[in-house]
């Protein structure tokens, strides 16, 4: 079962959708389709042990300089150790590592949010450019950890606010420490446990209120461990990677997340098996998403807090990551949003305040212009736009 696939190699154009999702089994870690695709691609029998380097025409892959032998009962298998790379900082700078001339790409987040026509701003977000020290990972295996997330609340702001305040704290507490055989498997388990614990904490607090809180929230989180992105997603917020394609000499929008709505076969089957139903594209005719934090009244009907988790290795061809709630994607396709941001980044007329680097001013302007444009196009929802710059 293909649980944890990789993005397309960077020199290739984005792949078309692979068609229908596999029926009857959950696919949490699959190959990442192009952003316009709604179905998941199917790949080979790759699990979590060894991550193939993302090939690049002239950039090469990030090499490792050592390997470790992992012994199992009756047989041994060689596995490459992940890159040993420098600790990241709040400022976006190129971080070079002597080991095999590897480079950790700097990450820095920017955000803009608009209430739109809603009475209340129910979105929340988190930007943590570097939480390596807080996570305290094994320095021989992991040397930079970053975290970026957007949360789109419904039924109130309490679930999204709770997730923004607590999910990364739970992640830090559960982050792998000590000896690790497989970083990929351990990080995956950490994310699954973190989402489960955060949801349980909120539901406990919500049920203790009188009347009980009925708030819920989507969650789209990008956890960067050195040059590997782990994307955990619940609901219909999205993460998109802008990657330059050397063959077409154009930038492509690659989807890093999978939307969860009750009309999808796998989601609908789970809901019906739990005793719920889907009417008018909604759980029990009310809830638009099939996975969320909170929504206690729907958890007994098959709505789950188990995230879809995907993995992507950054390459020198990657420009930025876009995280946004559905308020943006109701009026922008992923390709349109990526091209809009690129046009802003190339705008020489953007003014820079004294003491602020020009690149920061352009990314801030890109976030604000895209959020404004979404409102102008008629998005009636809250709009949150986060762009994570990838430095080379």
UniProtKB/Swiss-Prot annotation:
Q: Where is Mn(2+) 1 bound in this sequence? A: 152-153
Q: Where is the PTM N-acetylmethionine found along the chain?
A: 1
Named cofactor requirement(s): Mg(2+); Mn(2+)
Q: Which residues form a coiled coil?
A: none
Checking Gene3D superfamilies in the record gives: PPM-type phosphatase domain
Sequence ranges of Polar residues compositional bias: 56-70
Q: Which GO terms describe its cellular component?
A: cytoplasm
**N6-acetyllysine sites (modified residues):** 210
Free-text remark on how the cofactor is bound: Binds 2 magnesium or manganese ions per subunit.
Q: Which domain of life is it from?
A: Eukaryota
Q: Where is this chain's protein located in or outside the cell?
A: Cytoplasm
**Disordered: annotated span:** 1-91
Q: PROSITE patterns, from UniProt?
A: PPM_1, PPM_2
Q: Where is the PPM-type phosphatase domain?
A: 108-390
Q: Its catalytic activity?
A: O-phospho-L-seryl-[protein] + H2O = L-seryl-[protein] + phosphate; O-phospho-L-threonyl-[protein] + H2O = L-threonyl-[protein] + phosphate
Entry similarity comment = Belongs to the PP2C family.
What function does the entry list? Protein phosphatase that may play a role in regulation of cell cycle progression via dephosphorylation of its substrates whose appropriate phosphorylation states might be crucial for cell proliferation. Selectively associates with integrin linked kinase (ILK), to modulate cell adhesion and growth factor signaling. Inhibits the ILK-GSK3B signaling axis and may play an important role in inhibiting oncogenic transformation.
Self-association state and partner proteins as the record states:
Interacts with ILK.
Protein name per Swiss-Prot or TrEMBL: Integrin-linked kinase-associated serine/threonine phosphatase 2C
Q: What is the lineage of its organism?
A: Eukaryota, Metazoa, Chordata, Craniata, Vertebrata
Q: What is the gene called?
A: Ilkap
């Amino acid at each position: 079962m293909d649980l944890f696939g990789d993005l397309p190699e960077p020199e290739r154009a984005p792949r078309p959708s692979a068609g229908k999702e596999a029926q009857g089994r959950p696919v949490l870690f699959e190959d990442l389709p192009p952003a316009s695709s709604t179905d998941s691609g199917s790949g080979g029998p790759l699990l979590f042990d060894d991550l193939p380097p993302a090939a690049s025409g002239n950039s090469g892959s990030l090499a490792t300089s050592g390997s470790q032998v992992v012994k199992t009962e009756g047989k041994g298998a060689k596995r490459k150790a992940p890159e040993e790379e420098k600790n990241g900082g709040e400022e976006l700078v190129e971080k070079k590592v002597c080991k095999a001339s590897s480079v950790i790409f700097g990450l820095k987040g920017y955000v803009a949010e608009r209430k739109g026509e809603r009475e209340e701003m129910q979105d929340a977000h988190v930007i943590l450019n570097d939480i390596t020290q807080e996570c305290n990972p094994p320095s021989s295996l992991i040397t930079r950890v970053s975290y970026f997330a957007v949360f789109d609340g419904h039924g109130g702001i309490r679930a999204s606010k709770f997730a923004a305040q607590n999910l990364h704290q739970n992640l830090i507490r559960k982050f792998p420490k000590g000896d690790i055989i497989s970083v990929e498997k351990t990080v995956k388990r950490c994310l699954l446990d973190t989402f489960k614990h955060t949801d349980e904490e909120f539901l406990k607090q919500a049920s203790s209120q009188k009347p009980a809180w009925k708030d819920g929230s989507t969650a789209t989180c990008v956890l960067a461990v050195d040059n590997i992105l782990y994307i955990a997603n619940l609901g219909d917020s999205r993460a998109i990677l802008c990657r330059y394609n050397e063959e077409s000499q154009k930038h492509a929008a690659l989807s890093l997340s999978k939307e969860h709505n009750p009309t999808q076969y796998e989601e609908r089957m789970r809901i019906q098996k739990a005793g719920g139903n889907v009417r008018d594209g909604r759980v029990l005719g009310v809830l638009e998403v099939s996975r969320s934090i909170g929504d206690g009244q729907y958890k007994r009907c098959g709505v789950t807090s188990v995230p879809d988790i995907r993995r992507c290795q950054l390459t020198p061809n990657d420009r930025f990551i876009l995280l946004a709630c559905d308020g943006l994607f109701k009026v922008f396709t992923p390709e349109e949003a990526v091209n809009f941001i690129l046009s802003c980044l190339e705008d020489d007329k953007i003014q820079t305040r004294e003491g602020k680097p020009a690149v920061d001013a352009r990314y801030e302007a890109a976030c604000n212009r895209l959020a404004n444009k979404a409102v102008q196009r008629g998005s009636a929802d809250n709009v949150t736009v986060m762009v994570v710059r990838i430095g080379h």
